Amino acid sequence: QGGYALVMLTKNILIGARDIYGIRPLVIGKLGELFVLASESCALDIIGATFLREVENGEIVYIENNKLHSLKPFGEHKPRPCVFEYIYFSRPDSFLRGKTAYEYRKNLGKELAREDTVEADLVVPVPDSGNAAAIGYSHEKKVNFELGLIRNHYVGRTFIEPGQQIRSLGVKLKLNANKSSIEGKSIILVDDSLVRGTTSHKIVKMLYDAGA
């Protein structure tokens, strides 16, 4: 029960397992004659390994004597992957079910543009996770894309901070308005997900204060 992607190592065997719904990702790669397991395909690129495939939902794989073996002891179940992997958690260059997370996010931005009737001067992403969707929106709507917010990459995720005051401070430390790009402009602000609204409220005020 529950969502998991496990990797275990004994003296002679490397084991990987994924929950029956495939909630969390796990991939198989090959580096020379050796097999590699990782939570995202981008990790394989970093070490020069070749991506082979995803571990299927409910599958257990094990590598022994440089041979890959597969078991499916839990029967067949319909995959139910976590949507946050597609829109937020996974790195944009990681593959999920045949496409990169970047492609999924860009296509979501295009779909938003098709459904939306708002007119504005600029499309601005909430970086970095909103970048791909904003690019898709910009392409579909033919509205200029600008980095109206600059991110401090040394600050973590604000929505998981324990207190409201800390979350609010985290937003200010994490993002700053790029005044030269947005002053006097009307903006379509694109973000990937909203949890409490803490971040979006602060960001909108920040952009207004910068002259948008």
Predicted regions and their residues:
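N-terminal segments that mediate ammonia production and transfer
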Residues: 1-130, 138-179
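Short, well-ordered alpha-helices that flank and scaffold nucleotide-derived cofactor binding pockets
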Residues: 114, 135, 139, 205, ...
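PRPP/pyrophosphate-binding module of the type I phosphoribosyltransferase fold
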Residues: 170-212
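Residue-level marker for well-ordered alpha-helical positions
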Residues: 131-132, 201
